[in-house]
Amino acid sequence: MSMKYLMLLFAAMIIRSFADSGNAIETTLPEITNATTDIPAIRLCGPEGDGYCLHGDCIHARDIDGMYCRCSHGYTGIRCQHVVLVDYQRSENPNTTTSYIPSPGIVLVLVGIIIITCCSLSVYRFTRRTKLPIQDMVVP
């Protein structure tokens, strides 16, 4: 947005706030025409941008002077010169999620720890409930 448009919008908000508070002010705002509506926000560079981007498209932004690169998937950098490592690439579909499945060995170790803990707790509770010393439980 241009600065003139923002200033007119701000002035209209102030005028509306005065009108809502009971201080009626009548004014007419000038018609705003935007000459840049015919120019797309982003357009391709053309022949002068051939070879500027190594792995992507050369573009011109309407509000910023200069050539910029829109990198292809898997590349990054000012001129798309760096390869993104496969481990760090984001999916093209933002709705996909990556799930990590633990190895069976880790699952077995965790289940074993849980079983040993449960058995130890049950023996501890049994000895507290019966209040028998461990030596008395052993038959000579």
Curated annotation (Swiss-Prot):
Taken from the record's topology, the Cytoplasmic segments are 122-140
Sites where a glycan is attached:
34, 95
Disulfide-linked positions = 45-58, 53-69, 71-80
Q: Which UniProt keywords apply?
A: Disulfide bond, Early protein, EGF-like domain, Glycoprotein, Growth factor, Host membrane, Host-virus interaction, Membrane, Secreted, Signal, Transmembrane, Transmembrane helix
Pinpoint the site Cleavage (By host protease).
Answer: 96-97
Question: Magnesium: present as a keyword of the record?
Answer: no
Q: Name one GO biological process term.
A: epidermal growth factor receptor signaling pathway
| Transmembrane intervals | 101-121
Q: Per its record, how is this protein called by name? A: Pro-vaccinia growth factor
Q: What organism does the UniProt record list as the source?
A: Vaccinia virus (strain L-IVP) (VACV)
Q: Which gene encodes it?
A: OPG019
